[in-house]
């Protein structure tokens, strides 16, 4: 599967599982809501204190499997390096992340306050590999 097709699937299907690597080399997986930004990076909102962020600070590479709400159907796995954007730089990208996935928020001031309170960060995954290329 080419990167453009993989990103199109993620734009339409936001449910995903993110896989990061623990210090001992084992895999840690987290359910996430994924979107795609203007630079064709997969974007995910999470808390600064989440284990996935700790793992990505140590090894900034991840894999993500995205699938439809009904679970069965077309799915995609993408992999690549991850950038962590912390507040305050993350605020406007977090607003754009929300807009792309959910549309307009009824109270952007409240949204921004929650992002601050929760110490939200934005993960940006640059796709280097996408699949599957065959179905078994």
Regions found by a protein language model. Give the residues of each.
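Alpha-helix boundary recognition
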Residues: 10-11, 57-58, 116
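Short beta-strand segments
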Residues: 14-48, 56, 62-66, 75-77
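Extreme N-terminal tail/first-helix region
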Residues: 1-16
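Generic structural signal for secondary-structure transition and capping sites
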Residues: 14-15, 61, 106, 130
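Short gly/pro-enriched beta-turn/loop segments at secondary-structure junctions
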Residues: 11-13, 29, 118-120
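Short secondary-structure boundary segments
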Residues: 67-69, 127
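Charged, gly/pro-rich active-site loop segments
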Residues: 74-136
């Amino acid at each position: 599967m080419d990167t453009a097709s993989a990103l199109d699937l993620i734009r339409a299907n936001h449910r995903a599982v993110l896989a990061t690597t623990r210090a001992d080399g084992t895999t840690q997986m987290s359910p996430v809501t994924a979107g795609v930004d203007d630079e064709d990076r997969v974007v995910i909102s999470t808390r600064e204190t989440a284990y996935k962020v700790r793992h990505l600070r140590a090894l900034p590479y991840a894999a993500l499997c995205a699938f439809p709400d009904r679970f069965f159907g077309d799915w995609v796995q993408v992999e690549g390096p991850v950038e962590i954007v912390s507040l305050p730089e993350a605020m406007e990208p977090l607003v754009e992340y929300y807009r792309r996935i959910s549309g307009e928020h009824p109270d952007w001031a409240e949204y921004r306050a929650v992002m601050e309170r929760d110490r939200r960060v934005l993960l940006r995954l640059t796709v280097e590999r996408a699949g599957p290329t065959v179905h078994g």
